[in-house]
Amino acid sequence: MDQMKIGGFIALCRKEKGWTQSQLAEILGITDKAVSKWETGKSLPDYALLTPLSEALGITLSELCTPDMGDN
């Protein structure tokens, strides 16, 4: 999994919802700093958060783990 690509995709999906990092963090019960780390490619979401994150963003697990952002 490409951390930078996944992080960018999380940020894109979050912004499409009109949410701040803090709002997404609150939905998931985590800190906004964790969301920031994902979006900057410094870390990946914990395995236990993948399903809640994909559901919150309205995407599939497959889309989350292998984002196609049109750069192929």
Give the role of each language-model region.
Residues 2, 20, 31-34, 46, ...:
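Short coil turns linking two alpha-helices in DNA-binding domains
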